[in-house]
Amino acid sequence: MTINALLLSSSRVGDTPYLSHALPFIKPLTANAQKWIFIPYAGVSMSYDTYLASVVAGLSELRLDISGIHQHPDPRQAIKDADGILIGGGNTFHLLHELYKYDLVHLIREEVQNGKPYIGWSAGSNVSGLSIRTTNDMPIIEPPSFTALNIVPFQLNPHYSNYRAPGHNGETRAQRLLEFTRVDPITPVVGIVEGSALWRQGDTLSLLGDNPAYLFCGEQQEIPIPVGSDLSHLLK
């Protein structure tokens, strides 16, 4: 079996309805997967039931059977029984903390490596990389480790933007990622702009959407990656 993973930058683009822009990207992963488990652990400011309802509504036209992992007495068994895994956005630190709490990190990695489709957005994309060291989120809770799912062997930065508000004196996103590459100059970081996604199919990795992505690695800083690019070399 081969990895089939879709890593979305965000759940929305601008004012579009929830997950609507992503439906064309998501649909191919559902061709042979009807029963999906949704992991809402990144959702800190809403109930898990509310979060689940939003996802079910957003993906309704795909006619999937989606349940929340919080509805199952045995989270590990729920993942094993599902045809596919969905992980939503929110706070990446809380998400990874809960994945470790319920002993799901290695299980999810194993299931995805064995061919179970994976779809993540925002925090759900953050945890698909080597670690969560390039998330934008506030560290509101401390997971046992920053080591993540390693579905792709590099770092991700969803919601990438290098906008600086006039008069604002804080660091830009590019400056923050430069800091990472100074500490770890050999690990690539891919900044994914809202509306775009990475799709891994086995040993192939491609950039989907309407916006370029940006690569940071060592002395290479904010290198544009054109839409449709083959990024398979990042998997080696």
UniProtKB/Swiss-Prot annotation:
InterPro entries linked to this entry: Class_I_gatase-like, Peptidase_S51, Peptidase_S51_dipeptidase-E
Catalytic activity: Dipeptidase E catalyzes the hydrolysis of dipeptides Asp-|-Xaa. It does not act on peptides with N-terminal Glu, Asn or Gln, nor does it cleave isoaspartyl peptides
Main location: cytoplasm
Listed GO biological process terms: proteolysis
Subcellular location per the Swiss-Prot or TrEMBL entry: Cytoplasm
Class of the enzyme per the UniProt entry, highest EC level: hydrolase
Active site: S122 (charge relay system), D137 (charge relay system), H159 (charge relay system)
Matching SUPFAM superfamilies: Class I glutamine amidotransferase-like
One of the record's GO cellular component terms: cytoplasm
EC number assigned by the record: 3.4.13.21
Alphabetical keyword list: Cytoplasm, Dipeptidase, Hydrolase, Protease, Serine protease
Coiled-coil regions listed in the entry: none
Gene Ontology molecular functions: dipeptidase activity; serine-type peptidase activity
Pfam families in UniProt: Peptidase_S51
Function: Hydrolyzes dipeptides containing N-terminal aspartate residues. May play a role in allowing the cell to use peptide aspartate to spare carbon otherwise required for the synthesis of the aspartate family of amino acids.
HAMAP family tied to this protein: Peptidase_E
Family: Belongs to the peptidase S51 family.
Protein known as: Peptidase E
Organism: Shewanella sp. (strain ANA-3)
Gene: pepE
